[in-house]
Amino acid sequence: GIGGGSSGAGSDITITGGKVTARGGNYGAGIGGGAYGNGSDITVTGGEVTANSGNYGAGIGGGGWGNGNNISISGGKVTATGGTFAAGIGGGMHRDGNDITISGGEVSAAGGRCGAGIGGGLDARGSGDVTVSGDAKLKVRGGKTGDDGQGAGIGNGGVRDQNGPVNGTEVEPDICALNPSGKIEYYAPGSVMTGTPSKTVTNPTGDFVWDSGTVTTHATCKGKGV
């Protein structure tokens, strides 16, 4: 793949165009860290990018036992598929995905078995710092269940407790700056992500009109103004 070798981190990686196909070996990310290595400060601004891990590493992010941090995609067509127990974009097996921003382009993120589409690998978290904005068109799905629970579309990887498999918790991304043309499509864990999604998220819009008074609290995308 592209990034760190065995026990090596992969950081400060920028792709601006062209056609890039990156496949990591066992424990290595497609783009990012090698075995036990974090994948951080990874930026894609354009091009056609396909990133897959052989096993245990994220498509884009951490290798096996490596976190995926500060990953930004602002354009292009990006397909990221995690290896077994890893996220599509984010953490490798048993590691987290943090500070992930999708602000443009067409992005498809699929978790490997029990991994999140975007977020954490097996038994690991995807932080709340996932932002989808602009004209981004994002497709996500978690990995199918195994002995552990299925991964979230965006959020945590699956885990197993004393009672059996536990599915990964979904984390709500920040869509405050998502344009009307942008969207997030969630597909069933383990699916091929074609046809009708199980859920589509867009940023609702509306108009507020007033002709008098004083604004005392400005509206935000998460709350009304008065």
Predicted regions and their residues:
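Surface-exposed loop/turn motifs in large extracellular/passenger domains
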Residues: 1-24, 33-52, 62-82, 91-111, ...
